[in-house]
From Swiss-Prot:
InterPro entries, A to Z: Endothelin, Endothelin_toxin_CS, Endothln-like_toxin
Organism this protein belongs to: Macaca fascicularis (Crab-eating macaque)
Protein name: Endothelin-2
GO terms for MF: endothelin B receptor binding; hormone activity
Cysteines engaged in disulfide bonds, as pairs: none
Assigned GO CC terms: extracellular space
Annotated function: Endothelins are endothelium-derived vasoconstrictor peptides.
GO process terms (BP): intracellular calcium ion homeostasis; regulation of systemic arterial blood pressure by endothelin; regulation of vasoconstriction; vein smooth muscle contraction
Sorted UniProt keywords: Cleavage on pair of basic residues, Secreted, Vasoactive, Vasoconstrictor
Domain of life: Eukaryota
Subcellular location, record wording: Secreted
Main location: secreted
Family: Belongs to the endothelin/sarafotoxin family.
Length: 79
């Protein structure tokens, strides 16, 4: 009776994340795996590297090393 559960009524209370300076602290400064984990940025802060190519160009030519013309010629040769 002291606490009422709001089943579907309104929005549930949201908890705010505490802003901490670091994820964790290593017990030994010489531990590379701990240092890598503790000092790594969260994925939300990661930034994409800008590219001059469109995503389609990277997908089509990035893995094969072929230019647009070479790719088009290969497709013509197949058919």
């Amino acid at each position: 009776p002291e606490q009422t559960a709001p089943y579907g009524l309104g929005n549930p209370p949201r908890r705010r994340r505490r802003s901490l300076p670091r994820r964790c602290q290593c017990s030994s400064a010489r531990d590379p795996s701990c240092a890598t984990f503790c000092l790594r940025r969260p994925w939300t802060e990661a930034r994409a590297v800008p590219s001059r190519k469109s995503p389609a160009d990277v997908f089509q030519t990035g893995k094969t090393g072929a230019t647009r013309g070479e790719l088009l010629q290969r497709l013509r040769d197949i058919s």
